Amino acid sequence: MAKKTVKVTQVKSSSGRLKAHRACISGLGLRRIGHTVEVEDTPSVRGMINKVYYMVQVEGE
């Protein structure tokens, strides 16, 4: 069975944000505005997405 994934796109800058939020952005593999990555849909990834919801856009929920 294939693992479920979600596409995450960074839509706002991480500069000037909390250190923990910048860590979540890099933990998701995002590097710049407009960058899209496909990550496995796990509880830890969902937690990172929820923490930085205002900086990212999620597809495939």
From Swiss-Prot:
HAMAP family: Ribosomal_uL30_B. CDD domains: Ribosomal_L30. Keywords: Ribonucleoprotein, Ribosomal protein. PANTHER family: LARGE RIBOSOMAL SUBUNIT PROTEIN UL30M, MITOCHONDRIAL RIBOSOMAL PROTEIN L30. Signal peptide: none annotated. The keyword Ribonucleoprotein applies. It comes from the Bacteria. NCBIfam families: rpmD_bact. Belongs to the universal ribosomal protein uL30 family. GO terms for molecular function: structural constituent of ribosome. The keyword Iron does not apply. One of its GO terms (biological process) is translation. This is Large ribosomal subunit protein uL30. It comes from Saccharophagus degradans (strain 2-40 / ATCC 43961 / DSM 17024). GO terms for cellular component: cytosolic large ribosomal subunit. Part of the 50S ribosomal subunit.
